[in-house]
Amino acid sequence: MASPSRQPPPGGSGLLQGSRARSYGSLVQSACSPVRERRLEHQLEPGDTLAGLALKYGVTMEQIKRANRLYTNDSIFLKKTLYIPILTEPRDLFNGLDSEEEKDGEEKVHPSNSEVWPHSTERKKQETGAGRANGEVLPTPGQETPTPIHDLSASDFLKKLDSQISLSKKAAAQKLKKGENGVPGEDAGLHLSSPWMQQRAVLGPVPLTRTSRTRTLRDQEDEIFKL
């Protein structure tokens, strides 16, 4: 017969005294760890897979395997339920102690309507008073400002363009007429205003004077042509 296994004496020294021995790398959740997990129990159905459960709950397949101590994908059907680890934020662990501080911060950032409303009404009164002093008419909140109409049809645009072209043609023709009528008079006034031109008009054309130099130059040209 097999001998019964020995049990350690109560109160003895060793690894099993007061706590369970764990190997290196075991999944131990530390009390000081800021990341905590909340496990959700899922009833397995015939069409469930690890990938589908991971997508459904927003976790990874490795986390589901680690939480249920699974080593293959086919072993999930050996169990009726699976534990899905869901991470919880660290501030949820304070049991609402920091909720009052958050509310106070929100009240400081977002003031109440009773504090904002008087400032807005005073600003509107100042703007209306300045507009009346300058003679400007400010629109009331219920009244919309009339928007100027700038949209023209194609026919109106072409008519406007034709009228502008005709006006520019008339102005150019008038300028040409004024130039043709005014140039001869101006030239005559310029010619008569100068004393040299007046003297030339009275005496007539000035005859060319023949000097000895001109004669010698002409004789040299004749000799060149003869050669």
Curated annotation (Swiss-Prot):
Residues 1-22, 97-150 are annotated as: Disordered. InterPro entries: LYSM1-4, LysM_dom, LysM_dom_sf. CDD domains: LysM. Residues 1-11 have a biased composition (Pro residues). Pfam families: LysM. It comes from the Eukaryota. One of its GO terms (cellular component) is nucleoplasm. Keywords: Phosphoprotein. Residues 40-84 form the LysM domain. The modification Phosphoserine is found at residues 23, 33, 99, 166, 194, 212. This is LysM and putative peptidoglycan-binding domain-containing protein 1. It comes from Homo sapiens. The gene is LYSMD1.
